[in-house]
Structure formats: structure tokens, C-alpha cells
């Protein structure tokens, strides 16, 4: 969408820049535009509901061909370009139906030319505004996902930030996932071509720091926020060998030690399996760790490689194909096991943290066929093979006794047992809650206890009615329940009109943007936000090496946003034991 006086005479080499040009685009005086003095380029976007959006802005070059399984290269537009930023960018390689359990979500544009940004800002934002910048990293088990997913529509978030008096700019980074973002072999290690998802994200953040001021953002006030694997990526960036290029972090259902298989074995094993399926291991002298294997896989057509990748992924996780390929220690992006880095205090200071989880994070990951303690022990031993039988017995008899868990569900309570509920809670704490608490304390300790840390537990779900109507209300406050609230898009995206649900979305969205703006926790405006929110370890006057026995976790939702002292006390006792284990 460009000015007519410069359209004529454009060289064919600028086709990528002008790829969506139409005659009507040339005469859209209402379209917002941004001039970037760094590249002397102009971006033409869209506007709706008081929010301006700029879509499909490339920060990296095409990752196909010789750039497959290689570090991202910056994309630099030709000077004086007029760039159409009104169309969503392509999703990075993944199935057109990313999740078999969700056949209604179908991607129509999948390409290796996918390293792009989605930027949104309040209407009429000036380049001099210096608004806080919130950068979103999506989840999806390190396997699927895109910045343009309808669940991440930023309009409601931006609108609420304006209403709340803390306007922000939103940026979502598109990056490689699955094998394309987490291939792992000796040859790739030697060329520093591992953890490419994180390298993509890093390049995207560098673009933001260099160019966001043209959009009215403050490059010195960046908050990263993400959910699931997105939160894990953020936590790993904090522990990376590189300078941390952001100032605050919001970790929703993810931590650096959420995964306990980060030595690269899983990704390497599955990389070899994909290579075999693609006939890239057929020669006797062609070993999986050789450069020949990488070169062979670079020649495989994208769709064939995606198919082979997810055949292997679904052999690891038959339901979703998650985490067959995942972040791994490489000495470059991830210098060591995250638990070791946190224990040694090798973490940067002055990164403010807001982190939390949903009450029933693991309910959809634990089979309802668990009826007894023996069933529970068998499941836990399979999921966590490094835990011995005596430790599992201690968990199930002392720390997670069935007497602590009831089946008080309004929907078919007979479908689950106390043993299932205990197992769900234990799985949640092993994979997420206790690692989050340990990481939060380690980050606070690294700053000599001067950096604020806030924790929360979500106790309400926008999906409750749908779950009850489907007969699975016992699943409770499921994973991903926080995302619709944070983006404040219940009505537009999920057709949820309940006033109380939408009120919580407005308040939660307001608190997230307030945190990013530095106005957190907005005690004086509790009706517009979640109100008073005490620091997790705010009562400790002395900075101790040992984690305190008590922590403040804000309950969000049905309890009127109050802490539940008894439950948090039990949680800390359980985490005190879990965080001493190696598993």
C-alpha cells in the first residue's frame, strides 16, 4: 500500500517489499503509517476499534534452502521502501491443522519465510510517545504456534491499557518451532545452529530495540510476556550467555526448569529419527551427526519434512506431538542446565518478575483412568523416570495424600477419584509450580533482594461453562485459562458475554499492562485492575540464601483475589521437598 509517485519503476528485486500492492491500497488516506528513519522505510498498516496494527513486518530473512537449520539473518528492506504491513505473515513450518484435537483451527499460510512481527498500538500514537513495549512469545509445546493466532488478538489488551491510563505498544514475534527451531546434532552444535527458536526471538528483540521508537515505543522499557513454552523461552533468555535485552518478564505457566530433559538427548534422538524417515541416513558413511545429514535435510521439501517431523513427534506424544524437539543446553544460547545456573546464582540482576500458574495446570495431562495410589505411582514413575519408588511413595502418602483431595465437582464427580486429583496436583508441582517458585526466589536473590517478584495462581477459568456442559467440569482451571483474560478478548474471540468474566478480563489485562508500564500494582485503582498485590517475598528484611518458608501468592478469580494461606503453606512444604530433588 504505497504512494503513487514512487510506485512506477520499482525493481523486481523489491517484489517481497511490495508483495501485497493493489490499486485500492494506493488511495487509503485513513490507513496509519510509520516512517522508520533507521532504514528510511515507511510501513502502512490498518486501523480498527481505536487500535493501529502493522502486520507481517520481516525482521529475518527466509529460513528456507541453505538458511534451514541455520542462525537467522537480519532482513533489511531497501532504503526508501513503502512496505505493506496490512496482512498477517506466514506461520513457520508446522501442520496446516496444528493440533489434531482442534480440527477447527486451520492454517492457510505456512512458509519458511516466516520471521515477522505483529505490532499494535493505540490510535494516533506519535513517534515521540515512548510507550512501554510488551513483547509476546506464544506457546505450543515448542512444536506449533504463530503470532497471528486469533487467541492473541491484541486489540482488547491495547484498549484496556488506554482506559487504565497506562497505554502500551504490543509486539508479537513469529519464530521457528519443532524440528525447524530445535534441531540438534554435533554438526549443528559446531556451527552454533541450535536453539534456533531462541535465536529467532533474540533477533526479533534486537529489531524491536532498534526500530520500535519509530512506532512510538520506548526501546529502554521492554517487557517480555508469554505462556507455556513462550514463558519457558523468556526464562531461558534470562539465563542465557547474552546480555538480557529487556527489563521485565511475565511468565505464565512456564519456567526455565519446566523441562527436565534439556541435555539435548531427546532432540538429537528425534532429529536422527526424522533423518532416517527422510532417507538422509541411507549411506553407510553418513552419520547422523555429520554435516552431510544436515545438508540432506535442507534439500527435503518443506511439507515432506513437516510430515516426517510430526510422525516422529506423535510417536513421542500421541495427543499433540509436543516437546519432541525442545530447548537444549548448547553452551551458547543455554550455557548449562537451568537448575545449575539458578543454584549457582548465575542470573542477571534487576529483572522484575511476574509469574504464575493456573490452579489445575495438569488436569488435561493426567489420565482419568488413575483410580488408586498404585495407578498414580505407575503414572508418575513413567513421567519422571529419575524419581525412585521411595520418593514417589513419600509424595503420595505424606505430601499428596488422597485425604487432601476431594472430587467436589458439579459435573460428573464419579469420573475422577482423589487419587487422580492428587496425581494432577503432583504433576503440576513437579513440572511447573515448584520450578516457578524456585526460579522466582533465585532471581530475587541475585539482586540482593532488591528486584520485585510477584506470584499468582489463577482460580477462575473462562472455559468453566463449556467444560461443565461437556461433562468434564472436574478439569477445573485448566491450562491456557489465563490467556483469554490477559488479552481481554472474551467476547470477540470466545463469544463469552458473562459480565463477571469480562470484568476479570479487564482487571487482569489492566494489571499486566500496569506491570509493563512500571505503575504496578495500581493499589489506588483496584476497581480497574487486580488491586493490591504484595511482593512474593516482600516481608523478608534480610536477604537469605535459603528460600523462606512462606511466600505470598495472589489468588486471582473466584476467591475475590485473596491469598489462601493454608493452601500456599502446603504448597511451600511440598516445593521445599521437590526443589531439592534431581529429576
Curated annotation (Swiss-Prot):
Q: Which residues are glycosylated?
A: 84, 109, 221, 265, 307, 350, 388, 448, 468
Q: Which GO terms describe its biological process?
A: (M)-viriditoxin biosynthetic process
Pathway(s) annotated for this protein in UniProt: Secondary metabolite biosynthesis
**Which controlled-vocabulary keywords does the entry list?**
Glycoprotein, Signal
What do mutants without this gene show? Alters the ratio of the 2 atropisomers of viriditoxin by favoring the production of the P form instead of the M form.
Task: Point out the signal peptide segment.
Answer: 1-23
| PANTHER family xrefs | CARBOXYLESTERASE
What is the role of this chain? Inactive carboxylesterase-like protein; part of the gene cluster that mediates the biosynthesis of viriditoxin, one of the 'classical' secondary metabolites produced by fungi and that has antibacterial activity. The first step is performed by the polyketide synthase VdtA which condenses one acetyl-CoA and 6 malonyl-CoA units to form the heptaketide monomer backbone of viriditoxin. The product of VdtA is then O-methylated on C7 by the O-methyltransferase VdtC. The O-methyl group is important for the stereoselective coupling of the monomers at the final step of viriditoxin biosynthesis.
Its family remark reads: Belongs to the type-B carboxylesterase/lipase family.
This chain's protein is named Inactive carboxylesterase-like protein VdtD
What is the species of this protein?
Byssochlamys spectabilis
What gene name is listed for this protein?
VdtD
Amino acid at each position: 500500500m504505497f504512494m503513487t509517485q514512487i510506485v512506477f519503476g520499482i525493481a523486481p528485486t523489491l517484489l517481497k517489499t511490495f508483495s501485497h500492492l493493489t490499486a485500492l491500497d494506493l488511495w487509503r488516506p485513513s490507513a496509519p503509517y510509520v516512517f522508520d528513519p533507521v532504514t528510511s522505510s515507511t510501513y502502512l498498516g490498518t486501523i480498527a476499534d481505536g487500535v493501529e496494527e502493522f502486520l507481517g513486518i520481516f525482521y529475518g530473512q527466509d529460513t528456507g534452502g541453505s538458511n534451514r537449520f541455520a542462525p537467522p539473518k537480519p532482513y533489511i528492506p531497501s532504503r526508501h521502501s513503502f512496505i505493506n504491513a496490512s496482512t498477517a505473515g506466514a506461520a513457520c513450518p508446522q501442520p496446516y491443522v496444528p493440533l489434531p484435537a482442534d480440527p477447527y483451527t486451520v492454517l492457510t499460510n505456512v512458509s519458511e519465510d516466516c520471521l515477522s512481527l505483529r505490532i499494535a498500538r493505540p490510535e494516533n500514537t506519535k513517534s515521540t510517545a515512548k510507550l512501554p513495549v510488551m513483547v509476546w512469545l506464544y506457546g505450543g509445546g515448542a512444536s506449533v504456534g504463530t503470532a497471528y493466532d486469533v487467541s492473541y488478538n491484541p486489540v482488547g489488551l491495547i484498549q484496556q491499557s488506554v482506559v487504565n491510563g497506562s497505554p502500551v505498544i504490543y509486539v508479537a514475534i513469529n519464530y521457528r518451532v519443532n524440528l525447524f527451531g530445535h534441531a540438534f546434532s554435533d554438526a549443528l552444535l559446531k556451527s552454533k545452529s541450535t536453539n534456533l527458536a531462541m535465536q529467532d526471538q533474540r533477533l526479533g528483540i534486537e529489531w524491536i530495540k532498534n526500530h520500535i521508537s519509530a512506532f512510538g515505543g520506548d526501546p529502554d522499557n521492554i517487557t517480555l510476556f508469554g505462556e507455556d513454552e513462550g514463558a519457558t523461552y523468556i526464562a531461558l533468555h534470562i539465563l542465557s550467555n547474552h546480555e538480557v535485552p529487556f527489563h521485565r518478564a511475565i511468565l505464565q505457566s512456564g519456567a526455565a526448569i519446566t523441562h527436565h530433559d534439556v541435555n539435548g538427548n531427546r532432540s538429537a534422538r528425534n532429529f536422527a529419527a526424522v533423518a532416517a524417515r527422510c532417507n538422509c541416513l541411507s549411506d553407510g558413511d553418513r552419520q547422523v551427526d555429520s554435516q552431510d545429514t544436515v545438508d540432506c535435510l535442507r534439500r527435503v521439501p518443506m511439507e515432506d519434512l513437516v510430515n516426517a517431523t510430526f510422525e516422529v513427534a506423535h510417536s513421542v506424544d500421541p495427543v499433540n506431538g509436543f516437546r519432541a524437539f525442545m530447548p537444549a543446553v548448547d553452551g551458547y544460547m543455554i550455557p548449562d542446565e537451568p537448575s545449575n545456573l539458578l543454584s549457582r546464582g548465575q542470573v542477571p540482576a534487576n529483572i522484575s518478575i511476574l509469574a504464575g500458574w493456573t490452579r489445575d495446570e495438569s488436569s488435561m495431562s493426567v489420565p482419568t483412568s488413575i483410580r488408586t495410589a498404585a495407578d498414580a505411582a505407575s503414572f508418575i514413575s513413567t513421567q519422571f523416570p529419575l524419581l525412585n519408588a521411595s520418593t514417589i511413595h513419600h509424595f503420595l502418602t505424606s505430601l499428596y495424600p488422597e485425604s487432601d483431595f476431594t472430587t467436589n465437582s458439579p459435573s460428573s464427580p464419579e469420573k475422577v477419584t482423589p487419587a487422580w486429583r492428587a496425581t494432577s496436583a503432583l504433576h503440576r508441582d513437579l513440572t511447573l509450580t515448584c520450578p516457578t517458585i524456585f526460579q522466582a526466589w533465585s532471581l530475587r536473590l541475585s539482586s540482593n533482594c532488591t528486584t520485585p517478584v510477584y506470584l499468582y495462581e489463577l482460580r477462575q477459568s473462562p472455559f468453566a461453562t463449556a467444560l461443565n456442559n461437556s461433562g468434564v467440569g472436574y478439569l477445573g482451571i485448566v491450562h491456557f485459562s489465563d490467556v483469554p483474560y490477559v488479552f481481554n478478548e472474551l467476547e470477540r474471540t470466545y463469544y463469552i458475554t458473562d459480565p463477571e468474566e469480562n470484568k476479570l478480563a479487564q482487571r487482569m489485562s489492566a494489571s499486566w499492562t500496569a506491570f509493563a508500564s512500571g505503575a504496578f500494582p495500581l493499589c489506588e485503582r483496584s476497581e480497574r485492575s487486580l488491586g493490591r498485590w504484595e511482593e512474593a517475598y516482600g516481608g523478608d528484611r534480610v536477604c537469605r540464601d535459603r528460600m523462606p518458608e512462606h511466600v505470598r501468592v495472589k489468588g486471582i478469580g473466584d476467591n475475590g483475589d485473596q491469598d489462601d494461606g493454608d493452601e500456599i503453606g502446603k504448597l511451600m512444604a511440598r516445593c521445599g521437598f521437590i526443589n531439592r530433588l534431581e529429576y
